[in-house]
Amino acid sequence: MLDQKLIRENPTSVEENLSLRGKVYNISHIHELTVKKKDIDIKISSLQSESKKLSKLIGQEISKSKNNDSPELISLKKKGNEYRIKISELEEKQRILDKEVDDEIYNLPNFPSKNAPIGKDENDNIQVKTWGNPLKDENLKSHWEIGESLNIFDSVKSTKISKSRFVTLIGNGARLERALINFMLDMHTKNGYLELMPPALVNSESLKGSGQLPKFSNESFKCSNDDLWLSPTAEVPLTAFHRNELIDPKQLPIKYVAYSPCFRREAGSYGKDTKGLIRLHQFNKVELYWFCDPTKSLEAHKKITSDAENIFKKLNLPYRIVDICTGDLGFSSSRTFDLEVWLPSSKCYREISSCSNCLDFQARRSSIRSKIDKKNIYLHTLNGSGLAIGRTMAAILENGQQTDGSVKIPDALVPYFGSNFLKNA
């Protein structure tokens, strides 16, 4: 959430910063609302101060007067009652204005970082690094073809169970999924992350705090009888884990890692990636999440990206890092590095992790602060996939495919999978 004070005092700067996203944001209405809200806040504070002074006068008058019905006391009490009525009326106006401001401000995205490349869409993203040697062979199979030949997942029967864009992992497919989850969790916990296993169902306030609501309500699955949603990413419950808290600065930085199932409608993706493991309604992911001192978030962003990179290197998967331009940034992000893995069958890199610095955007929405230099300030939050499991499996199947139809398991994963090769059972 953007700072209301900044919107109220410098609306032009706010519009200029938001315009870097490639859209026009007219905040004149919300600016007007924040000015009215501040005016009412001042009036309420002034009346409350006067009311306290009046209460003291009434107390003094009662103590020195034997007659509780004296004209002076009656006049003071009448004035006190007028104050209470006026304060109550203003507080009701304040409540209505608060809701109007929230309805507007919660739909405004984060400011893009000054270091993010200026651009309109994904075509303006900048490649900043590549690693590994991408396989380039016309005869290489897609991961869904490999999966079908090895009988490790089934999409057809999953459609019968649920609908399209679901998959059932079978035998060695389920085994490989478990191996990847445990491998990634072990890697990250050894690197100083504390593992959490959060709920898969989250309430609206949690989604609002991380930035999914209200803007992206059509992209998530909602329970019909409760204020609960299937979590689209562990970023949501990890943000909410410290909602409305004042965190001891001695605890910073807080680094969490969490495995969770993720659920997304994938609205707007009709016809894209209809086969395989790339774009599903349900998928597993290992998420990295930081809470840190605002002065340390730039370095933290480099570190969380490096921690995600480490998984690619250990699995020997060719990848690249892309600096996301201002027009392609996620709603809550100020700066994002996408980590994309090479998929030989597609002859391109595909996003498998987004490492984002959200500055104080999520912490402000979730009221997560720390007392630093004697001031209560909003912390900075960072998140990154470490990694998406299904897409990692797809990359292993394609990059590790052998001429005999088997798949070579990366050396670092062998202790978890229990075999050097994935073969048809």
UniProtKB/Swiss-Prot annotation:
It comes from the Bacteria. The keyword Iron-sulfur does not apply. L-serine binds at T233, A234, E235, E287, S385. It is an enzyme of class 6 (ligase). Keywords: Aminoacyl-tRNA synthetase, ATP-binding, Cytoplasm, Ligase, Nucleotide-binding, Protein biosynthesis. CDD domains: SerRS_core (cd00770). GO terms for cellular component: cytoplasm. ATP binds at R264, R265, E266, E351, I352, S353, S354. One of its GO terms (biological process) is seryl-tRNA aminoacylation. Its EC number is 6.1.1.11. GO terms for molecular function: ATP binding; serine-tRNA ligase activity. Pfam families: Seryl_tRNA_N, tRNA-synt_2b. PROSITE patterns: AA_TRNA_LIGASE_II. Belongs to the class-II aminoacyl-tRNA synthetase family. Type-1 seryl-tRNA synthetase subfamily. Homodimer. The tRNA molecule binds across the dimer. Consists of two distinct domains, a catalytic core and a N-terminal extension that is involved in tRNA binding. This is Serine--tRNA ligase.
